[in-house]
Amino acid sequence: MALMPKRVKHRKSQRGRIKGNATRGNTVVFGDYGIQSLDAGWIKATTIEAGRIAAQQYVRGQGKLYIRIFPDKSVTSTPLETRMGKGKGEPDFWAAVVKPGTILYELSGVTEQQAKVCFARLASKMPVKVRFVERRSA
């Protein structure tokens, strides 16, 4: 089931601009390995779910997958062949706003080689460029 907020204050949001790099959510916290976004963009809830399924099919209960992004922005669209005007369209899908440096997924309980293969499968589903990162031991 695709992720979406339980309830929101406003159903329709403005598109906005994605400026700068991520200052929060840019370090591996829960797992041992992660994938980090190198581009800015929107990631649909269905895309997040497709990535989750691809990763979990590969690890098969060995490791634990953590999803670090949540689709909290509603993206609206008007029906095809509709004339201009008549207000803003209805919410079409939910998306997560991702900045460069944001950690998208984390993985624990697997070897580094397994994590790299798993994230390579997952990266093919993502609309942004990503890279493999490890947890830094302080």
UniProtKB/Swiss-Prot annotation:
Cystine crosslinks: none
Single GO term (MF): rRNA binding
Presence of keyword Iron: no
Gene3D superfamilies noted in UniProt: Ribosomal protein L10e/L16
Region called Disordered, residue ranges: 1-21
GO biological process, alphabetically ordered: translation
InterPro entries referenced in this protein's UniProt entry, alphabetically: Ribosomal_uL16, Ribosomal_uL16_bact-type, Ribosomal_uL16_CS, Ribosomal_uL16_dom, Ribosomal_uL16_sf
Keywords, ordered alphabetically: Ribonucleoprotein, Ribosomal protein, RNA-binding, rRNA-binding, tRNA-binding
Protein name: Large ribosomal subunit protein uL16
Transmembrane segments: none
High-level lineage: Bacteria, Pseudomonadati, Planctomycetota, Planctomycetia, Pirellulales
Job description of the protein: Binds 23S rRNA and is also seen to make contacts with the A and possibly P site tRNAs.
Keyword Cell inner membrane: no
Ranges of Basic residues composition bias in the record: 1-18
GO cellular component, one term: cytosolic large ribosomal subunit
Family as reported in the entry's similarity comment: Belongs to the universal ribosomal protein uL16 family.
Complex formation: Part of the 50S ribosomal subunit.
Gene: rplP
PROSITE patterns named among the record's database cross-references: RIBOSOMAL_L16_2
PANTHER family tied to this protein: 50S/60S RIBOSOMAL PROTEIN L16 (PTHR12220), LARGE RIBOSOMAL SUBUNIT PROTEIN UL16M (PTHR12220:SF13)
